[in-house]
């Protein structure tokens, strides 16, 4: 597994620290925007989109990704984009939901490391949260994340527990976030419903906090979409519900 690779010597980045020890992107002072821009340019992102990413890196002091690694993610109704060697052509191929998720989460992990934007990845059933971008660790934390993504999914969907833990994190950061006019970004990758309680009730304490929530669905199942839309309609949250890349493209085309 990638996490067993030799540890690199980590050089601490001077970021603000919350009471629970989590580092914050304090007004973007510690970001490596040049390296982030180079990373995105190599992926052939246009300058306008790169500028949008840079703006978001400043806006969000901390990023949290909840990653659904439950057994249902092994279903083979996902989609993935495969590009040609020269990056000029791409095609959609069918894959497991987990493969679709893993490709996207890997990208966010790489961006967090390249930009040194403090980011936390929380797998529903496996291990402890992985922090990327809080120190210049030679890519060790990114390797751990990639190793987790190479494992097979299995287990249930305890979203409520993780949402409650994230709420405590945001509450611990609230004073500094408001002082800096920043927010926390929370993205939930999932293909279903919570298995450990009322998710709307778990999300409700986030109301009024400086946090934006994105639900990234890894399925086009109508019942799952209805479930999440119902939650959204009953909460006063900054919340967006997104289908896969191709579904979003079809909506705006």
Predicted regions and their residues:
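Surface-exposed acidic, glycine-flexible loop patches that form ligand/cofactor-binding
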Residues: 52-57, 110-115, 168-180, 204-205
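Eukaryote-biased feature marking scaffold/signaling PDZ-domain proteins and nuclear chromatin regulators
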Residues: 58-61, 96, 114-119, 154, ...
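Intrinsically disordered, low-complexity regions enriched in proline, serine, glycine
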Residues: 74-76, 110-122, 132-133, 175-179, ...
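VWA/integrin I-like adhesion module and closely mimicked acidic/polar interface patches used
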Residues: 77, 154-157, 192-235, 242
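Von Willebrand factor
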Residues: 57-183, 185-189, 194-196, 218-226
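P/S/T/G-enriched low-complexity
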Residues: 3-26, 50-60, 221, 226-253
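Acidic, polar low-complexity linker/tail segments
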Residues: 13-90
């Amino acid at each position: 597994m990638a996490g067993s690779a030799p540890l690199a010597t980590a050089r601490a980045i001077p970021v603000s620290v919350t009471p629970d020890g989590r580092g914050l992107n304090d007004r973007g002072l510690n970001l490596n925007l040049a390296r982030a821009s180079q990373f995105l340019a190599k992926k052939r992102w246009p300058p306008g989109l790169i500028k949008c990413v840079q703006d978001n890196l400043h806006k969000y002091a901390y990023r949290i990704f909840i990653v659904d690694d439950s057994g249902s993610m092994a279903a083979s109704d996902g989609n993935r984009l495969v590009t040609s060697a020269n990056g000029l052509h791409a095609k959609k191929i069918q894959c497991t939901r987990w493969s679709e998720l893993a490709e996207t989460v890997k990208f966010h992990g790489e961006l967090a490391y390249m930009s040194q934007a403090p980011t936390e990845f929380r797998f529903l059933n496996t291990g402890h949260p992985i922090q990327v971008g809080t120190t210049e660790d030679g890519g060790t934390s990114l390797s751990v994340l990639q190793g987790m993504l190479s494992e097979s999914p299995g287990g249930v969907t305890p979203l409520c527990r993780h949402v409650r833990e994230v709420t405590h994190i945001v509450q611990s950061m609230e004073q500094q976030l408001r002082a800096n006019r920043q927010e926390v970004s929370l993205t939930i990758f999932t293909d279903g419903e919570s298995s450990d309680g009322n998710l709307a009730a778990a999300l409700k304490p986030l109301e009024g906090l400086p946090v934006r929530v994105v639900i990234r669905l890894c399925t086009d199942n109508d019942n799952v979409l209805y479930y999440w839309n119902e939650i959204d309609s009953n909460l006063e949250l900054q919340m967006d519900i997104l289908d896969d890349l191709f579904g979003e493209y079809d909506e705006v085309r």
